[in-house]
């Protein structure tokens, strides 16, 4: 299924992206759920899938994490089942992500899907990332507050909430409606009837993640082996003093690594092309030979990217799942980065090069791309 998003992107980016929340009524016309509640519940029984149940009764909140064996103990009100990265495990839901590729691929994270019974929700809370919440089957009431300094608390060790807030948006969403919320705006949603919601979340690494990730890269490649030296050690009034110029020199030693463009690009390509959630990688058995890949494409078969696989381009380099893809065939690499589905036409003359076919075969045999059907 192909989903068509009714949205004036230039206007949205200017007025709302990372600025103000907004309800997009009938963002998807005639919306059809790509997954059923039963299918979602089945996914939450799998150990590889990240899921949780959130419920509340008389002001007391409970959170449990999957995989779940049964749902028989749940009542008819006040609970929600939330499943992360469903687009990694259920191919039809991945189609919901594609209309949002007007925004950079490296900023898009995953598709979280929730099923809620009446009264179900996770309470008032803040997110530090952008999210588009699509209303599927059923109705849900959403409240969004102003972006202010808010006190957070934990009614349960696995649940972070904020205090009650005054709403600037208070709307009942129906199938196909979309609520966009930028980072830092408090919000809460409660199902009015059995309801499905689809949250397209965005990735925003913080400084701590960046420094930690770059440090791992430096250690793995044994970079930064230069030692501090001071042949002209300056005098000081007290031997315990560390002088400002020494602090500057130490800072410069660290910045020198980050300021190497090729290393910084290589690190960030590997870092940001890795998914935060497990992928449904299933290498083909037996593995494909390069000539089999060639024949299949020439016969019109379509090569499809694995759901959730992050394929990104930085300059002339393309990265997939933390690996740099090397090939002199730039148009073919661009096709891998730009297209979800690929045909022989996308690869052009590159298919006649045995080295490119060997590289493509390795990607397919890693489970990153597969033949449709």
What are these regions (language model features)?
Residues 1-16, 28-177, 185-228, 232:
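Active-site region of the double-stranded beta-helix
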Residues 12, 19, 324-373:
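Long, charge-rich, low-complexity alpha-helical segments
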Residues 51-55, 142, 315-321, 371:
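Short polybasic amphipathic segments
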Residues 55-56, 265-270, 347-348:
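Short coil/turn segments at secondary-structure boundaries
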Residues 220-292:
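C-terminal amphipathic alpha-helical segment
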Residues 259-337, 361, 373:
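Acidic, low-complexity/disordered tracts enriched in E/D and polar residues
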């Amino acid at each position: 299924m192909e989903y068509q998003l009714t949205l004036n992107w230039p206007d949205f980016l200017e007025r709302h992206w990372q600025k103000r929340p907004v309800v997009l009524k009938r963002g998807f016309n005639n919306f059809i759920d790509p997954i059923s509640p039963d299918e979602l519940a089945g996914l939450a029984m799998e150990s590889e899938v990240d899921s949780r149940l959130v419920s509340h009764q008389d002001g007391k909140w409970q959170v449990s994490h999957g995989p779940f064996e049964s749902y028989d103990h749940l009542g008819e009100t006040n609970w929600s089942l939330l499943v992360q990265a469903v687009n990694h495990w259920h191919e039809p839901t991945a189609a919901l992500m594609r209309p949002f590729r007007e925004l950079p691929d490296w900023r898009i994270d995953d598709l979280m899907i929730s099923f809620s019974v009446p009264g179900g929700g996770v309470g008032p809370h803040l997110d530090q990332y952008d999210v588009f919440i699509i209303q599927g089957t059923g109705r849900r009431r959403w409240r969004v507050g102003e972006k202010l300094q808010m006190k957070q608390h934990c009614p349960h060790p696995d649940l972070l909430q904020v205090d009650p807030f005054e709403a600037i948006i208070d709307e009942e969403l129906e199938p196909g409606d979309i609520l966009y919320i930028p980072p830092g705006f408090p919000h809460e949603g409660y199902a009015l009837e059995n309801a499905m919601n689809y949250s397209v979340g965005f990735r925003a690494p913080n400084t701590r993640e960046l420094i930690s990730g770059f440090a791992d890269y430096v250690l793995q490649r044994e970079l930064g082996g230069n030692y501090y030296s001071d042949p002209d050690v300056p005098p000081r009034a007290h031997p315990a003093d560390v002088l400002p110029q020494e602090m500057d020199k130490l800072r410069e030693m660290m910045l020198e690594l980050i300021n190497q463009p090729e290393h910084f690009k290589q690190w960030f390509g590997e870092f940001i092309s890795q998914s935060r959630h497990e992928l449904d990688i299933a290498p083909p058995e037996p593995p494909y030979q390069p000539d089999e890949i060639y024949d299949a494409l020439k016969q019109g078969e379509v090569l499809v990217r694995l759901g959730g696989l992050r394929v990104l381009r930085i300059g002339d380099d393309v990265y997939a799942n933390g690996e740099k893809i090397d090939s002199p065939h730039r148009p073919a690499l661009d096709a891998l980065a730009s297209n979800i589905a690929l045909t022989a036409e996308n690869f052009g003359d590159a298919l006649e090069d045995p080295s490119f076919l060997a590289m493509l075969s390795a990607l397919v045999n890693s489970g990153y791309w597969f033949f449709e059907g």
